[in-house]
Amino acid sequence: AARNPGSWANGLKVAIIDSFADQVLSVGNTAGMSVGFGVTQTASGTVPGSGSTSSLDGFFKGIITDIGTGTISVKFLSHTPSGGTETEIDYSASGVYRFNSSSDITAVNNSAVGVATVAVNSVSDWFDSQTITTTNNITNNSTTISWNQIAERPGTSAYAAARNSRFDEVHVVVIDDDGDITGNAGTILEKNLNLSKAKDAEFSAGSTS
């Protein structure tokens, strides 16, 4: 983590997070599912408009990014209304564009064939559960820092969006893990937020990130 050599930097910790997933769905049985498979669910909810509201129909689509014990982590990708065209939409933690436990989900393989339909027992927000653990080597006490206390969830940079790409952003923080530098273990020394993982990404001013 240090810019120059020396034991002074041995206590530094670098933590990185990207938009790996949006939600964790507890489904019990994950048989037949694999990372990279699609997930669909009947769309529901009410969308406010100008002087009126409308009810969602059609279906939501996402992708499985991880499989745990009875759980799958998913990215929310799009909404396709009944008889309409698929539209890319970002996950909304407190809105209607998210998977929920009100109806089953169907896992779809890479050949667009449904391989499993299961009930969703519960849903949790992936980003809100991500933490960084620091350890003071002198006292052996651990401190937990929640990522959602450091920054908003990573998303898509304007540079990537203009090139029809998504989910390239990443946050990087440098932490005084054991307190040797600041005297306070767990102090965040640097925050580099909303960087891009894209090889050719640029800041709005034109320099590479």
Describe these PLM feature segments.
Residues 1-209:
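Surface-exposed assembly/interface segments
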